[in-house]
A protein has these predicted regions:
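Surface-exposed strand-loop-strand hairpins of Gram-negative outer-membrane beta-barrel proteins
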Residues: 69-84, 103-118, 247-249, 282-293
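Cleavable N-terminal export/targeting peptides
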Residues: 1-59
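Outer-membrane beta-barrel transmembrane domain signature
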Residues: 94, 179-296
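Transmembrane beta-strands of outer-membrane beta-barrel pores
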Residues: 66-72, 92-94, 101-107, 130-132, ...
């Protein structure tokens, strides 16, 4: 039943992606047949320098997210705890750098131990993107500095990824991103997503998004994984949530998101957000539960 639902979800994403391309291409062809007037030419000529100057300006963004749960690629990284995630991004001429952290205010424990808040993660992302007509293309690098889940806990090894992304400036903005882990975990992660925004007025809009992923492991070692510490790659798991020496290779997780950005003043926006994450296959269900907090109810 889960595999059937996953197929329907992926088919829907694919159809929406193709629909977005079809809708934008048709108007583009019709516009090419229209003769260009002198007035239009003059307007374009004068607007281009202003647009170029606008694009040359450095950009910056600061944000703080308060979440009821930290879920990353389907994995439940926190449980019964509020997490705080500050983020800072700077950009210039297509280049950008982002620094993001995660503070777990009440680390999960199977016993009655009450751990104090713990800084569990700091991520650095460097990227470059460029637009070619309706096509957006980008490359990047991510360094995940991972901390122990609680005081006295075992610190997992840090992780590094490179990624390539392709997107279309069409309805639903279909985007495909391929991530490759190049340090300890040795896996590929492919993510296909669509999104759309409905602007109610200048201050309030509704943003909807959906994504589906595929995980391809290059390495699996059940003994190392069961020993803990974050080693052992991405193995496939049995229905009893036991690691095997088989590499995971299947559709992984889906995500549905809705947010309501509200612009309070010029530089301050509040965005209530709700997300629903779920496994796409039975293999993914076992793997996600075994690796996340759900394995320790």
């Amino acid at each position: 039943m889960m595999k059937k639902n996953a197929r329907y979800f992926l088919y829907l994403l694919s159809i929406l992606s193709i629909l977005g391309l079809m809708i934008v291409v048709s108007p583009a062809w019709s516009q090419e047949a229209k003769p260009e007037t002198k007035a239009a030419t003059a307007t374009t000529a004068t607007s281009q320098p202003a647009q170029a100057a606008e694009e040359d300006k450095p950009t910056g963004e600061l944000s703080v997210s308060g979440l009821t749960k930290y879920i990353w690629r389907g994995y439940e990284n926190t449980r019964n705890s509020i997490v705080v995630q500050p983020s800072m991004t700077v950009g210039y001429k297509g280049f950008s750098a982002n620094l993001r952290g995660n503070l777990d205010t009440s680390p999960y424990a199977q016993s009655n131990i009450n751990y104090s808040s713990t800084w569990t993660e700091t991520d650095l992302t460097l990227s470059y993107s460029k637009t070619f007509g309706i096509l957006n293309a980008g490359v990047g690098y991510i360094y995940y500095s991972l901390g122990a889940p609680n005081a006295g806990g075992v610190k997992p090894p840090d992780s590094q990824e490179v990624f390539v992304t392709l997107g279309l400036n069409t309805l639903l903005t279909p985007t495909l991103t391929a991530y490759k882990e190049v340090d300890h975990y040795r896996q590929y992660y492919f993510l296909l997503g669509v999104s759309h925004a409905f602007e109610f007025n200048k201050r309030v809009s509704l943003k909807l998004g959906a994504s589906a992923s595929y995980l391809q492991s290059d390495y699996a070692d059940a003994v190392l994984f069961n020993a803990g510490g974050g080693y052992g790659g991405y193995p496939k798991f049995t229905d009893n949530y036991q690691a095997t020496n088989d590499k995971f290779s299947n559709f992984h997780d889906g995500l549905l998101t809705a947010s309501l950005p509200i612009s309070l003043v010029k530089y301050i926006t509040v965005a209530p957000t709700v997300s629903y994450a779920f496994p796409l296959t039975n293999d993914a269900k076992n793997e996600i539960k075994a690796r996340g907090k759900q394995a320790n109810p």
